[in-house]
Amino acid sequence: MKRVPASDFPALRQFFGGYLHEDFVEEYGTPAVALKTFEADADEDERRRFHAEVKRFLEVTAPLDFADVLRLLSRLGSRWTPPTREALIAALTGAADR
């Protein structure tokens, strides 16, 4: 497996470190609420970069084993461990609320 550099995803690193950190459950309760809060806090350019990176992240990680994806999430600063790839996709795309 080719290692995906966390540095390729600065907007995701900012989101994970700022919203899905070790205290996110106490602060937000769920990844969906953390995402909504980020989107409310971010300006239009930050939201655009985030959504572009989410799309690229999901494309790049699609062929990877989920364990490798979880390691990448940790390197990006996430302290949330999604139970499945589908849960990760739903959380990052806001589909968890739909």
Model regions: which residues?
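Charge-rich, solvent-exposed alpha-helical interaction surfaces
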Residues: 15, 34, 53, 69-72, ...
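Short runs of predominantly hydrophobic/aromatic residues within well-ordered alpha helices
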Residues: 8-13, 31, 47-51, 85, ...
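Short terminal alpha-helical segments
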Residues: 1-36, 93-96
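Amphipathic alpha-helical binding modules
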Residues: 68-98
